[in-house]
């Protein structure tokens, strides 16, 4: 019986998920870095509460690119856009584009937001903390 070498899954066959860590402890549970070949999970996360936290971070980027309008529902187009962007990032920086995406999410995630509180018809804006799952979105 011959031993088969198990090849790790690389995104688009080029970029590895190994060695990438989330430095922000608040986002660590919500940024999924599960290895995958293509960012397409066929919507398996839709049937449970908070299951979108288990979706790969690259697929979440692709899903957010499909906003209502001209790009609505065109996932193949969004995947190709992300693939081309990752190739450009890889050529210009020489680093793993997945790691750059994770750092960008960490740096761009807001920590505070404001909410409206009304007392007797007067509206006050009050600072509140942002949930980690919303910070990733």
Regions found by a protein language model. Name each.
Residues 1-79, 83-137:
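Strongly charged
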């Amino acid at each position: 019986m011959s031993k088969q070498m198990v090849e790790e899954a690389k995104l688009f066959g080029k970029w590895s998920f190994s060695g990438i860590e989330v430095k922000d402890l608040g986002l660590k549970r919500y940024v999924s870095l599960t290895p995958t070949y293509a960012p397409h999970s066929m919507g398996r996360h839709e049937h449970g509460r908070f299951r979108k936290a288990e979706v790969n971070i690259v697929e979440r980027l692709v899903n957010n690119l499909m906003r209502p309008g001209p790009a609505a529902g065109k996932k193949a187009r969004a995947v190709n856009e992300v693939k081309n962007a990752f190739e450009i990032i890889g050529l210009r920086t020489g680093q793993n584009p997945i790691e750059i995406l994770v750092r960008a999410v960490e740096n761009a995630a807001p920590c505070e937001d404001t909410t409206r509180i009304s007392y007797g018809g007067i509206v006050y804006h009050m600072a509140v903390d942002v949930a980690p799952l919303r910070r990733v979105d």
